[in-house]
Amino acid sequence: PQFNRSVKAKYPPGSTFKLVQGLIAMQEGVLTPNMRYSCHRGYKYGGRTMGCHDHASPLDLREAVAQSCNADFCQVFKDMITNPKYGSVKEGVRVWNEYVYSFGFGRKLGTDLYGEGAGNVPTPEDYDKKYNGRWNYGSVLSCSIGQGEMGCTPLQMANLAAIIANRGYYYTPHLVKSIEGRDSIDARFYERHYTMVDSIHYVPIVEGMWRGVNVSGTSRTAYLEGWDVCGKTGTAENSGPDHSTFLSFAPKDNPQIDRKSVV
């Protein structure tokens, strides 16, 4: 009862993390909203397959978000970390680390809640230790869909919903009892923290989240008439039953509320 899971527990974000992967890839120039990738029930690499569910193919970014296509985001992640401009996969992962940190992952957000955890974002040094320095993109591919070594607190994942709703920035989460005018608020409480991704790249991601709820996709059960909900589902493997995650905000334009659930 003393363990506050919202800030202390660490869970793989699952497919909700695909939103971050798409944003980073667009900023790095290896993905555009209209690029289409084929999916034949999964992504094949090194004699293995990262499975996916049955859906239409090929998909552009918006539909890949709506349908939560594993193959699409595996390819996007590979293209990002193997970009020749980095010189090596190790350096590609290092650049990826910096982007992910800018979304508030892998570090404490600085809330008022006691015992806040930092979660985990795997680094090249982590993989060097795990694989004795011998690893490639296939070794880290599970991170493309928010599994593997990725670990986030529920608050960090809720913060991701706020970042996307705001098209690229967040405020440090705080507990508030009452507010009496902006002048009474400490300036720290309305300081914006921007990600490394330009706001224009959030547009197709938001559209994909909206389609997934309101048109066709894995988030259809979150539909609420008149609310224009945007959402993204996630499932992550676990030693026991799978973890299920869901993040959302509403309405699509000028959002007023976001939420995150972990089951």
Locate the predicted segments by residue.
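Beta-lactam-recognizing serine transpeptidase/beta-lactamase-like catalytic domain environment
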Residues: 1-15, 20-258
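Conserved small/polar residues in nucleotide/adenosyl-binding loops
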Residues: 262
